[in-house]
């Protein structure tokens, strides 16, 4: 069988070389600690450049400014940071030992993701690329579950794990948001409207 992980996001979780969390996860748009970093990045790059590069404006939802906040305000944590993960990629790492992230989630890491080339591309010098996970598509197989994860979870050693994605993307797919014009409203701790449009 296969396991697919979907968890809250986008968020930021710095981990050390063993994959252990160095601090509590920094949540999505409800966490506004990186307000100054958003302003600074918009001043240095121009909002239109950021939007064209990553497909999103910088907001409290964006992970890139939060990484910059971490560097500026918690250098002790930043110094130990091996990878920057999300809740989904943290769980996938616990299951497989591999650091991966799906493209949909990566697009929320502005200004670190190039939406046209579909790759990491830090146009602002916010984060060394080696600290970011390998990019995959959410349905790609990352690999088999590790023996220790099988023991912890009770899953079979024959289980494979997909890259997975964040909660909103999984929910959109589950309710049929697949074509231009489709949309959904997601109610949770916050409310999101997700709509597919046929434009770039």
Task: Tell me the role of every PLM-derived stretch.
Residues 1-64:
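Active-site phosphate-binding/coordination module
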Residues 7-8, 87-89, 189:
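Short, well-ordered beta-to-alpha junction loops that form the rim of enzyme active sites
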Residues 11, 34-36, 61-65, 107-111, ...:
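Conserved A3 ("GATE") glycine/threonine-rich loop of ANL adenylate-forming enzymes
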Residues 15, 50-166:
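Gly/Ser/Thr-rich active-site cleft segment
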Residues 16-25, 75, 123, 178, ...:
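A glycine- and small-aliphatic-rich helix-loop capping segment at beta-alpha/alpha-beta transitions
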Residues 38, 121, 145-146, 174, ...:
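Short helix/loop capping segments that flank catalytic or ligand/cofactor-binding pockets
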Residues 151, 155, 159, 164, ...:
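Catalytic phosphate/nucleotide-handling subdomain of diverse soluble enzymes
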């Amino acid at each position: 069988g296969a396991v697919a992980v979907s968890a809250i996001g986008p968020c930021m979780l710095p981990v050390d070389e063993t994959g252990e969390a160095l601090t509590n996860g920094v949540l999505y748009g409800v966490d506004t600690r990186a307000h100054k970093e958003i302003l600074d990045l918009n001043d240095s790059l121009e909002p239109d450049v950021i939007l064209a590069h990553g497909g999103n404006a910088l907001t409290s939802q964006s992970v890139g400014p939060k990484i910059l906040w971490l560097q500026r305000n918690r250098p002790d944590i930043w110094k130990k940071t091996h990878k920057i993960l999300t809740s989904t990629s943290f769980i996938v790492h616990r299951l497989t030992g591999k650091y991966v992230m799906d493209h949909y989630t990566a697009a929320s890491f502005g200004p670190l993701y190039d939406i046209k080339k579909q790759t990491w591309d830090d146009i602002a010098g916010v984060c060394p690329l080696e600290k970011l996970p390998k990019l995959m598509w959410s349905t790609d197989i990352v690999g088999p579950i590790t023996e220790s994860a099988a023991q912890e979870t009770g899953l079979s050693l024959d289980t494979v794990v997909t890259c997975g994605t964040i909660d909103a993307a999984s929910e959109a797919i589950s309710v049929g948001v697949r074509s231009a014009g489709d949309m959904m409203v997601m109610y949770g701790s916050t409310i999101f409207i997700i709509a597919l449009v046929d434009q770039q």
